């Protein structure tokens, strides 16, 4: 039996200094990003918050060891109407394995990338997604659109990316319950002064998306609740996820970010 290692990483602002419609030709963090990605040892990887990665030279500099890369913009109405400077945002995919098919996943007001690899008896499909930042209701709609797409066939599938949602509280222990209470109090305080963190934190504590994916047969690969996202400087939330259906997995890991992002990369091994 062989294995295929899949990585997922939200690279803050794509590695650039800020969100902008006009970006410099060279990614200022490209060397640091490339070192972190190389250290993961992933056969395939999904990159979210990939601002500017529609430029093939940017992808090549950050992903030098991969023979195939692709990019899709998010097409997010919420993103482009409220923050037009973020229109370069998207999801990138890279692999060293033979690609059988690749399609854009229409999530209603965002897009993902579905890539089927020529691996195993039935192939292996990797759905790279980056769900909405603030609204759990929008994330729920996007998750349902994702399932509608994936349920067309029974290809073994991995969903991986920054889902901007957390594990359901009933699946966690007392420590997470206490932390959740603190976050809810912080959300109320931020909302009282009309700070955008209020909406963001309130949405994170709704925790509805993963149960929807679980009900459709997708298993969360995480073996613990180690956080992946820094908010704003401490690792507090596990919002980057890898879920599988129709295949076995092992060796879920959270890796150091190397100072290249406000998210830690994750990897899992898929048995073929």
Model-derived segments and spans:
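Active-site regions of metal-assisted phosphoester/phosphodiester hydrolases
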Residues: 1-39, 44, 84-272
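A short acidic/basic microdomain associated with nuclease active sites
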Residues: 67-80, 103-104
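Short beta-strand and adjacent tight-turn residues that come in two discontinuous sequence segments
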Residues: 47, 71, 244
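Metal-dependent catalytic neighborhoods of phosphoester/phosphodiester hydrolases
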Residues: 48-65, 78-88, 170-176, 235
